[in-house]
Regions:
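N-terminal signal-anchor transmembrane helix
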Residues: 22-41, 45-47
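C-terminal, well-structured subdomains that either form a transmembrane helix-short loop-helix hairpin
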Residues: 115-146, 156-164, 168-171
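Intrinsic disorder
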Residues: 5, 48, 129-132, 153
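Membrane-embedded alpha-helical bundles of multi-pass integral membrane proteins
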Residues: 1-18, 22
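Reductase modules of NAD(P)H-dependent flavoproteins
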Residues: 1, 82, 87-99, 103, ...
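FAD-binding FR-type
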Residues: 39-128, 143-147
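Short helix-terminating capping/connector loops at secondary-structure junctions
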Residues: 103, 150-156
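Alpha-helix termini
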Residues: 148-151, 181-183
C-alpha cells in the first residue's frame, strides 16, 4: 500500500515539475508594486486562454524563492495576471522585489489552471461577495459575466467588496479598463 501511495506521489510531482520546466524558459512576468494596497501585480507574458475566470495556478519564480511554488487566483488569463497581497515569506519578498525595481521582469513557471467556476448565466440576479484580496476570484467572475451579457439581458449583478482601506479598492478601480479587457 505504501508503495502505491509513494508511486502516485512521485508521479504527481513529476508531472508538476515537467509542466514548470516546460513553461519556465519561455515565460516572464512583470512585477508591479501596488503600494496603496500592499500588493504586487504579476503579469505573465504567456496567456492561458483555456483557463476559466477565477481559476488558480501555481507560480514558480526562482529569483524570489528557488524551490517553492505557490497557488494564486488569476485576475485575468490573456495575459495571465495575478494580484498578490504581501503577507509573509514569499509574498513579502515578491512585493519587496517589485518595489525595488517596478516593472522588473523575472522568469516564471506556471502550473495549472485549476478550479471549478460556478455557472451564473441562468439566474436573474447574481450577487458576488468578497473580502480583501479574495476579490481576485469574484472580480474575474464579474468581468466574465459582464462580457457574456447582451443588450436585452434582464440579469443583474451586485458586486460587494469589503476592504480595510480605500487604497485597497484602487488596485482594481484604476486598472479596471485594462483588467476587464483581459479577464475573459
Amino acid at each position: 500500500m505504501a508503495l502505491i501511495a509513494t508511486s502516485m506521489y512521485a508521479l504527481d510531482r513529476s508531472i508538476r515539475l515537467s509542466r514548470l520546466i516546460y513553461y519556465l524558459p519561455l515565460n516572464t512576468a512583470t512585477l508591479t508594486p501596488l503600494r496603496a494596497s500592499n500588493a504586487t501585480r504579476v503579469t505573465l507574458s504567456r496567456s492561458m486562454a483555456y483557463a476559466a475566470p477565477g481559476s488558480h495556478a501555481f507560480l514558480y519564480i526562482p529569483s524570489i524563492r528557488a524551490c517553492q511554488t505557490h497557488p494564486f487566483t488569476m485576475v485575468s488569463r490573456d495575459p495571465v495576471e495575478f494580484v498578490i497581497s504581501a503577507r509573509n515569506g514569499f509574498t513579502k519578498d515578491l512585493f519587496k522585489a517589485a518595489c525595488e525595481r517596478p516593472g522588473r521582469k523575472v522568469r516564471t513557471g506556471i502550473e495549472g489552471a485549476y478550479g471549478c467556476v460556478p455557472k451564473t448565466l441562468g439566474y436573474d440576479r447574481v450577487v458576488l461577495f468578497a473580502g480583501g484580496s479574495g476579490v481576485t476570484f469574484t472580480f474575474a467572475l464579474a468581468v466574465d459575466w459582464a462580457k457574456k451579457q447582451d443588450a436585452e439581458s434582464k440579469q443583474s449583478l451586485d458586486f460587494i467588496w469589503s476592504v480595510r482601506t480605500a487604497g485597497e479598492s484602487k488596485t482594481f478601480i484604476t486598472n479596471d479598463n485594462d483588467s476587464s479587457n483581459q479577464a475573459s
